[in-house]
Amino acid sequence: GLGDVYKRQMMHMQGTPQNMQKEPHYENLLKEFFIYFARKVQQLRDLGVKDIILDPGFGFGKTLEHNYELMAHLEEFGIFELPLLVGVSRKSMIYRLFGTTPQEALNGTTVLDTVALMKGADILRVHDVREAVESVRLIEKLKSVSACS
């Protein structure tokens, strides 16, 4: 079946690449996300796909506020019991907040990567590998010490 051959990363995006940033609107952001992913996950499972990775699609068809609302509630994606991929590296949700550029967004990227890891992200999509690895190692250490307490 398809599940034996294909793995799927499923990313949320409102609209198309051509219009996704033109006034994105959600009545209830989290509810709409969970309905979207529940349907898509079921469709893939019905096709026999076993390995599915969820990606909230930070920066794709979302306002600055939408992106931060998603990050604030990231742990709630755990209800799907699937790996969660987060890609915020140098995204406008960081540099627009500070009025800087993508090249100046490393510190913000590292902070949000760390927050994402603490809130359940399993995979990070990054530009700056060394810094991301440091975040992963620090969070793994923190979690290992917490588990021993």
Segments the model singles out, each with a brief description of its role:
Residues 126-149:
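C-terminal helical cap(s) of enzyme catalytic domains, especially alpha/beta-barrels
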Residues 54, 116, 128:
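Conserved, mostly hydrophobic/aromatic
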Residues 7-15, 56, 82-89:
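Non-cysteine beta-strand/loop elements that form the S-adenosyl-L-methionine
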Residues 8, 52, 124-125:
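Hydrophobic residues within beta-strands of alpha/beta enzymes
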Residues 16-23, 93-98:
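A short acidic, helix-capping loop that chelates divalent metal ions and anchors anionic groups
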